[in-house]
Amino acid sequence: MKRCAPAVLRNYNYKKGIWSTGVPDHIRKLLRDKSTSPLCSQDERNLVSYFMARGSVPLKSVGSGLTKKATTSITSNSATTTFERQYLIKYLYRHQAYGNVIKIAQKFLYTTIGSQRLLKQDASLPELKKFLLSLLILQRGIQLDQAISDIIQRFLLTQKTMVIDLINSIFSRMVIMNMHEEAVYKWVKWMKLVNGHCEFTNYMENKIVLRNFLSFMRQSNVRPDYLSYLKAIQLTQGPAIASQFATTLLFLLTYIRKFSSAEAVWNYKCEHNLPIVSSDLTCILKTYCHMQKFNLVSSTYWKYPDAQHDQNQFDYLLVAHSRLHNWDALQQQFNALFGIGKLPSIQHYGILMYTMARIGELDSVNKLYTQLLRRGMIPTYAVLQSLLYAHYKVGDFAACFSHFELFKKYDITPSTATHTIMLKVYRGLNDLDGAFRILKRLSEDPSVEITEGHFALLIQMCCKTTNHLIAQELFNLMTEHYNIQHTGKSISALMDVYIESNRPTEAIALFEKHSKNLSWRDGLISVYNKAIKAYIGLRNANKCEELFDKITTSKLAVNSEFYKMMIKFLVTLNEDCETALSIIDQLIKHSVIKVDATHFEIIMEAYDKEGYRDGIINLYKTMSQNKVPANSKILYYILKAVAKKSLQNNEEIKETINMVEDIMENAANGTLDVTYNKLHPSVMAWPMRMIVKHDSPQRALELYNRYNELFFKKHDWISNNNKFVMMRSLLVLLAQIEQWKDFETLFAKYMDRIENIENLPSSTTPNIKLRSIFSGLFPYKVSQLIAMNKIDELPLLWKKLREKGFILDNISWNSAVEALFKDPRTLSYGMKIVDDTLIHGYNLIHKFRLLTKLSEDKTQSSDKSWPTLKMKEKEPNKFQPRLYLKSDTYNSIMRQLDTYLDGIDDLKTLEDQVRDFISNYKYFMKDYLLMPRSKINKWEQIEMRHLSYFKELRKSKRVLPVSKF
């Protein structure tokens, strides 16, 4: 049967169908009824009796030998056609005549071939579904089993997907009818008939089979009794089927994170001596790790050697070992084996290497790897995983790729955890496209389980690129295509992307949609934390306090991130650093939650904005006293504080230089207590720029080279130097020593890097974090263009940056304008920028200065009111322009325009030029012409020729139409 049959059937109606000419009018009239109410018994009896008395069109395959003429005669007069059969079954089902649906189906859907009674080949999916549902509704279980058996026998080889769809439809209807135990029993029985077994351990491979059953397991209004189902199946269908179904249950329960039920199913298998397969062992180890029963992981793993065929199992074993032992004790245990004359096995190496990899002991891991190779051992999964993890932990991402290739070299299958590490490597490289390639590879390998953790990592990566569209698409792909249950992990990741993309309201909408359906085990606190972060971004203190109250009243277990949000709320919205410090004091003494660098970082950032250098230094002392590892941002703030303090006290900055060198050296050799041994470039980039300005460019270059030597191998220098923070520092260095040719080359690379990022396949939305990437840097570019006599290139560059949405600070605008006014070729472009933007901010600032001065002047009338001034007092930020002409720039461009106009000898030409400027740049020219331009030759004549214009302009101080000039 062609799959197009159901589609045709869905679209047919009474009028479009081809009815036999012999169908009586009273039957046709009945069939035109479109209602769903039950038929009266007489009408139903007449209708069914009529069709039961007729035959059906013979199948060609039967080979009845009828002539074409005879067949046509039957069709037109006495035989029931396929269309009539389909319409009749649908009609009777709609009118709830289930008994007669069965009667008609048994007569017209079946045919006899030889001694066998088989379903017809043209039986369609909707017909069969209504037939089966009618049997179910009338509780005819034996007939239902027989009908399913007939369908499997007839269509399994040609229409397996349709058969599975029918079984799942009946299963879902049984669930709706609260026949849960019977539904599960039948589903297992029928799936065994279809597949020859009932053991399914990969959702994506068996999505069609498992989709409805998984939906049943997830329903909040259903409480399945899995052990009861297993007992019934074992009793009636035998232990082999019960064991297979238990394996399926165990896999699905861990897939949807119902670990308590998964443990109960595992215990059932063990208590009833059912066979333990590889999937069972993997699932129970995963369950024990999630339930933090680490002491059971090792004993369970070693108890079932015949089931150790999945690399993921060793991941859970390694995690458990690392949680239960400190690495010093493991090292001693490992070394003791040599002492008693027993050489460590490859398993010993794997466990010890992984434990040391977790704490970033790369040298120890490499030494052990070299040692086992010298002993002629072949690396195992655990050994290779440990090597990969150790290099990831220290930020050696380039080495991660080469170590990942070792899995292929030694013919070892990477596990889910291996791919997770590689996704984290791409996250460290900020390479979303590379991460997508990993996901594509995973989706093509049915042996690898794709988890929520994989998607959460990918979604989180969208924070850096602020690509909320891709993040949302990933979330939908996870929940809809892979049918992975979302928890706080993926929801909070998506919320974070919305927040970083400046869409906090969408993050809040996500919180309101999902928070009600999550439990604390599902990471509910993570979702609350992101909601608080979103409200902080909206500066809504009341909503933040509401969420804090909800968390407290519901006694939700909090985490480190919660306290981070509380500190951020106090510092950002309440401007209460004292209370924030008291929370840090509480965390230092907390028995469960550990204080970390991110808690201190928030307060340090606030102190940095205020210029409170001593506060930053005192906070760092507190961290040192309590052995809290610093991160790169903490080191950045402390270095900046020390440097700024030295400059304020007119001291030399040698102390800062020495401090930077010490920090780099100690971080590189592992003696500095930091969260990450490879320091972020910003730690030395800011001091480097400061040294360029206040000490020696040569010293800054030495610092830069030393940083590369300590933290990057020679072949990694190029990739490190391509980072924006490093390129910015080098650009500042080159500008300070006026190496303009090199500056021009590097700036072109800087622009190319931005364009490459914008042209990546994953760059479907603009990255708002790149908008300010030219702030503080653009004035140097202007200086380079002036020095190389290329200022005529500035308008095109300026236009390009503005069109792409880059934000340039006020210093950049002023430096650009001043440069443009100095060159006759670009003066008009500079005037346009001033007229469109900067002059308005300048006038607003000076207007308020004048109003403030007048309001403070005692000689003025005391009852004089200034409404604009009062408005500014109420909303000061609203009347503070972000872009404006600085006074020195204003004076400079006025002089430059004087010089330009003074160079025009012809009075008529001068007059036309002024008129043209008034027409095109009216706001700027209004300010310019408020004072007589005495430095311009022939200006007195201009004043005399346009006396009324200047008189009105200087009196009204408002823009006048050019026609009045």
From Swiss-Prot:
**What cellular component GO annotations does this protein have?**
mitochondrial inner membrane; mitochondrial matrix; mitochondrion
Annotated GO biological process: mitochondrial cytochrome c oxidase assembly; mitochondrial translational initiation; mitochondrion organization; positive regulation of mitochondrial translational initiation; RNA processing; tRNA 3'-end processing
- At the top level of its lineage, which domain of life is listed? Eukaryota
Places the protein is found: Mitochondrion inner membrane
The membrane-topology field of this record reads: Single-pass membrane protein
Asked whether the keyword Repeat is assigned, the reply is yes
**Keyword Mitochondrion part of the UniProt annotation:** yes
| Major subcellular site | mitochondrion
Keywords assigned by UniProt?
Answer: Membrane, Mitochondrion, Mitochondrion inner membrane, Repeat, Transit peptide, Translation regulation, Transmembrane, Transmembrane helix
Q: Which Gene3D superfamilies match?
A: Tetratricopeptide repeat domain
Any stretches that span the bilayer, and where are they?
A: 237-256
PPR repeat ranges, renumbered to this chain: 310-344, 345-379, 380-414, 415-450, 451-486, 487-523, 524-558, 559-595, 596-630, 680-714, 723-763, 774-808, 809-844
| Additional record remark | Present with 1160 molecules/cell in log phase SD medium.
Q: What does this protein do?
A: Required for initiation of translation of the COX1 coding region. Also involved in the stability of the intron containing transcript of COX1.
Q: What is this protein called?
A: Mitochondrial COX1 translation regulator PET309
Q: Which organism is it from?
A: Saccharomyces cerevisiae (strain ATCC 204508 / S288c) (Baker's yeast)
Q: Provide the taxonomic classification.
A: Eukaryota, Fungi, Dikarya, Ascomycota, Saccharomycotina
